[in-house]
Amino acid sequence: MPRVVIGMSGGVDSAVSAFLLKKRGFDVIGLHMINWDVQEEGTSHCPRSKDESDARNVCDRLNIPFHTVNFVKEYWNDVFLKFLENYKNGRTTVPDIDCNQSIKFDVFHKIAREKFNADFIATGHYATTNFGDFQQNAKDSDEIRLFSGKDPLKDQTFFLCTVNQEQLKRAMFPLGSLQKSEVKRIAEEQGFQEVAKKPESMGICFIGKKKRFSDFLDEYIEPKPGRILLKNGSEIGNHHGIHQFTIGKRINGKYLEARSHLGFFVSHIHSDTGDIIACEGSHHPDLYASRFLINHPKWIRTFDPFNRISSNNFLCRIQRTHPPIPCVAEKQEQFLSVIPRLALRATAPGQMCVFYNTKNECLGGGEIMNIQETL
């Protein structure tokens, strides 16, 4: 049977994935990735030693080999520095997407292949492909296509939108056809109560329990004071750095001289001047984008879908927790101009816009460069 190296996070999803692989007869090896230096982390919701211990215990229970691999340097250089640079320039970013592309489906697979002679890697993502959750339908002559997992609330294709053909063809997603409730039930039936009861990791794990997001960024980004202005140019406050703000976020009253019962929200960030543009009310028209530009989108299949499919058949999403909505996309040289059917709130440069077709196939995505217009 093929050898599969599975990424063991110490959580319930990777535990059940490993069990399902072993049940199907694969030669399974568990590999725990260390991506963050605990000296940087401090006290955390996801302490490395606990996760590593839980992952090891699951592998011991399944009687499969367990190893660890250190990707701290790669994660710092390929994911974290980009994350900081984006926030330093007032852009919103999704580090999980970069982590999947550069770490989990790149250097992780190289280690799996070169050190452990693996045929495939596996992860606990809620996603599936036309090749099947276990590559059982794979054909060398076919292109692999990425589809949403069975559980719409847990679907993680959003975070896999930049993974390419080669990377997907060597990957398995054992949970693609399962609901989260089924995964937890299997975990409890197999005696994995410890991981089944663990809280799900939410947000960016390296920030740590004791820190607020803005405090964490302050540790790495030098403060650069600026003004908070209304659209008409009136100054209503001052701030210590644009990295503490994102489009759509309510502005803390400590930064403001003006007051409003509706509250003031970030509608634009000028990285060149350091000015924050504010608007009044959480549903102000300036917080909604009806058109935005995507730069150099990456497609999962080997062709540009906009050359073959009517743009009216596309859906897009800019946040994983929001369902895809219909959109029209127009090619403008290396850019795509995207017009969602409904204006989207808090659309920010740096965010990823991920495209789907009407068959729940994830086509790819690209970074939002700028907002062309609002309602």
Curated annotation (Swiss-Prot):
What Gene3D superfamilies does its record include? Adenine nucleotide alpha hydrolases-like domains (2.30.30.280), HUPs (3.40.50.620), Translation factors (2.40.30.10)
Q: What is its EC number?
A: 2.8.1.14
Q: Where in the chain is the site Interaction with tRNA?
A: 125, 250, 351
Top-level taxon of the source organism: Eukaryota
Which residue stretches belong to region Interaction with target base in tRNA?
A: 94-96
Instruction: Give the UniProt entry's GO cellular component terms.
Output: mitochondrion
Q: Name one GO biological process term.
A: tRNA wobble position uridine thiolation
Give each disulfide bond as a residue pair: 99-205
Which reactions appear under catalytic activity for this entry? Answer: 5-taurinomethyluridine(34) in tRNA + S-sulfanyl-L-cysteinyl-[protein] + AH2 + ATP = 5-taurinomethyl-2-thiouridine(34) in tRNA + L-cysteinyl-[protein] + A + AMP + diphosphate + H(+)
Q: Which InterPro entries match?
A: MnmA-like, MnmA-like_C, MnmA-like_central, MnmA-like_central_sf, Rossmann-like_a/b/a_fold
**Binding site residues for ATP:** 7-14, 33, 124
Where is the segment annotated Interaction with tRNA? 154-156, 319-320
* Subcellular locations according to the entry: Mitochondrion
Active site (record annotation): 99, 205
Q: Which GO terms describe its molecular function?
A: ATP binding; tRNA binding; tRNA-5-taurinomethyluridine 2-sulfurtransferase
UniProt keyword annotations, A-Z? ATP-binding, Disulfide bond, Mitochondrion, Nucleotide-binding, RNA-binding, Transferase, tRNA processing, tRNA-binding
**CDD domains recorded:** MnmA_TRMU-like (cd01998)
Any other noteworthy remark? During the reaction, ATP is used to activate the C2 atom of U34 by adenylation. After this, the persulfide sulfur on the catalytic cysteine is transferred to the C2 atom of the wobble base (U34) of mitochondrial tRNA(Lys), tRNA(Glu) and tRNA(Gln). The reaction probably involves hydrogen sulfide that is generated from the persulfide intermediate and that acts as a nucleophile towards the activated C2 atom on U34. Subsequently, a transient disulfide bond is formed between the two active site cysteine residues.
UniProt function note: Catalyzes the 2-thiolation of uridine at the wobble position (U34) of mitochondrial tRNA(Lys), tRNA(Glu) and tRNA(Gln). Required for the formation of 5-taurinomethyl-2-thiouridine (tm5s2U) of mitochondrial tRNA(Lys), tRNA(Glu), and tRNA(Gln) at the wobble position. ATP is required to activate the C2 atom of the wobble base.
Record family assignment: Belongs to the MnmA/TRMU family.
Q: What is this protein's name? A: Probable mitochondrial tRNA-specific 2-thiouridylase 1
Query: Its encoding gene is what?
Result: mttu-1
